[in-house]
């Protein structure tokens, strides 16, 4: 049975019981800031649905869902359960209320239950992401050729931006209250970019891209260095493909370190239409 959660007190003890669980802890609830933003505030937001799954009056699952009808898009902000039936009920709830929507799930790579159920629904999975956190930043790195996004470069930026994601160049540019973007410029041409949040205590690069023909010229390092420099005095974390050894070494050389037990897996699913 599913009930709408109307107050944090209804689910706080249940959520706390998942901290540190190697299989079922939620990488979206690793800090107090994440608990506030992804769970507590979601209960109050009109575009979020926080639901509890119950069996014999006992909570067996807790899910926070961001739902954007205009975009036909859903993002699971919180997903906590150790029971297959709870995940099944949550997915059926999506099928009942938002058929045809695109849904993104970010969860613990050890959560074999959710992965199996999404596999059965033919979801697409991205590579496992390794979390890294900035310790002592390496300052003084040359950032020549790196500029903040401006109107004059907007068209070029949007043209090369990754379009196979919710946060397209156009959406990032409109979300000035959340993101700042840095561009790599070569002879007046945009050859790379980095989108990074700036409003949190621990900010995160969302997307880093350099055109193929301009790679191995140091632009990725310069973009990250500029983002770190402008982020002071806040912290920074990032996610990188867990098997991308060259990128991990680059980030380690700039002061980032791996965080054990906080990797994540992202799945994309087109909600089934009944």
Question: Model features per residue range: what roles?
Answer:
Residues 29-90, 194-206, 212:
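Conserved donor-binding loop and adjoining core beta-sheet/short helix segment
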Residues 103-107, 205, 236-240:
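Conserved hydrophobic beta-strand within the GNAT/NAT acetyltransferase core sheet
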Residues 109-127, 221, 243-261:
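Conserved active-site alpha-helix within GNAT-family acetyltransferase domains
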Residues 31-35, 142-206:
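Flexible, substrate/cofactor-facing loop regions flanked by secondary structure
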Residues 67-70, 76-142, 265-267:
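Acyl-donor-binding surface of acyltransferase catalytic domains
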Residues 1-34, 129, 138-167:
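Short amphipathic alpha-helix that is part of the acyltransferase structural core
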Residues 83-96, 210, 216-230, 248-253:
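Conserved acetyl-CoA-binding loop-helix of GNAT-fold acetyltransferases
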């Amino acid at each position: 049975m599913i009930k709408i959660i109307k107050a944090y007190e209804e689910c706080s003890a249940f959520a706390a019981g998942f901290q540190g669980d190697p299989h079922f802890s939620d990488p979206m609830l690793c800090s107090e800031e994440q608990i506030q933003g992804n769970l507590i505030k979601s209960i109050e937001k009109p575009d979020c649905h926080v639901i509890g799954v119950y069996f014999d009056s006992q909570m067996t699952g807790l899910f926070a869902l961001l739902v954007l009808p205009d975009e036909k898009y859903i993002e699971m902000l919180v997903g906590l359960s150790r029971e297959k039936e709870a995940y099944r009920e949550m997915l059926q709830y999506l099928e009942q209320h938002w058929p045809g929507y695109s849904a993104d799930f970010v969860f613990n790579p050890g959560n074999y239950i959710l992965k199996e159920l999404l596999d059965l629904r033919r979801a697409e999975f991205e590579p496992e992401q390794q979390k890294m956190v900035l310790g002592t930043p390496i300052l003084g790195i040359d950032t020549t050729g790196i500029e903040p996004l401006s109107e004059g470069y907007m068209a070029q930026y949007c043209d090369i931006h990754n379009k196979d994601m919710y946060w397209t160049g156009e959406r990032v540019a409109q979300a000035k209250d959340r993101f700042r973007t840095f561009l790599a410029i070569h002879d007046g041409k945009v050859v790379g970019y980095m989108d990074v949040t700036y409003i949190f205590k621990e900010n995160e690069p969302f997307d880093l891209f350099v055109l193929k023909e301009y790679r191995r010229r140091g632009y990725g390092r310069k973009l990250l260095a500029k983002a770190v420099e402008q982020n002071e005095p806040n912290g920074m974390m990032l996610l990188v493909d867990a098997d991308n050894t060259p990128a991990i070494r680059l980030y380690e050389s700039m002061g980032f370190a791996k965080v054990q037990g906080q990797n994540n897996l992202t799945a994309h699913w087109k909600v089934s239409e009944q």
